[in-house]
Regions:
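Accessory helical-bundle/CTD segments and flexible terminal tails appended to RecA-like ATPase motors
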Residues: 1-186
Length: 186
């Protein structure tokens, strides 16, 4: 039961990655690094299928290689190049693969802002920040004061979001809009 609660808190993919790293550390005789999460980027969960379908790319080895390359991309340009390469090699991207790339872009932006987790579903969700995020604090205050029914702080590091987002396009637009709003002013 404790594990399922922890899994829900950080997201399944990140949870399994952290668990795997912890097991490797223990096997090597070291203590797991609890601050490791901050160095490996934001967890973005939009509750949408985000994958490379078997029907699009049947070879599991090639799919795994592409997943690793998407995960390793350090900027939007690298993601766009990879999209073009996949379209050239395998044809137009199915919806799930488009979601995968869009979430990878959101993850890059969220990581740069110091967001630990961005979770948006049908009814909204939350943003969890690292201890010292790179966001404009006034933008958070303006969101909460301007739309108190939709935004509120839930503890010192979580922004709770209450919005109807039943459509994937609405969810992506809301996520992009929030990340843009939170950008620090230059």
């Amino acid at each position: 039961e404790d594990q399922s609660g922890q899994m829900a808190e950080v997201g399944f993919s990140l949870y399994t990655e952290l668990l795997e790293r912890a097991v490797k550390s223990i096997k090597a005789g070291k203590l797991p690094d609890v601050d490791d999460i901050d160095r490996h980027g934001a967890d973005v969960e939009l509750h949408l299928p985000a994958l490379i379908p078997d029907a699009y790319l049947p070879d599991p080895h090639t799919r795994l290689t592409l997943y690793k390359r998407i995960s390793a991309a350090r900027d939007v340009a690298a993601l766009r190049e990879l999209q073009v390469e996949m379209i050239d090699r395998f044809g137009l991207l199915p919806e799930q693969a488009k979601h995968l790339f869009a979430i990878a872009e959101l993850k890059l932006d969220a990581t740069a802002l110091g967001i630990r987790k961005l979770d948006l579903g049908n009814k909204g969700g939350r943003i969890q920040f690292v201890e010292k995020p790179n966001v404009d604090p006034m933008s958070v205050i303006r969101l909460i004061q301007g739309q108190p029914k939709h935004y509120r702080m839930d503890g010192p590091d979580k922004l709770r979001i209450t919005l109807e987002l039943p459509d994937p396009a609405l969810r992506f637009n809301a996520a992009r809009g929030l990340l843009t709003t939170l950008q620090p002013t230059q």
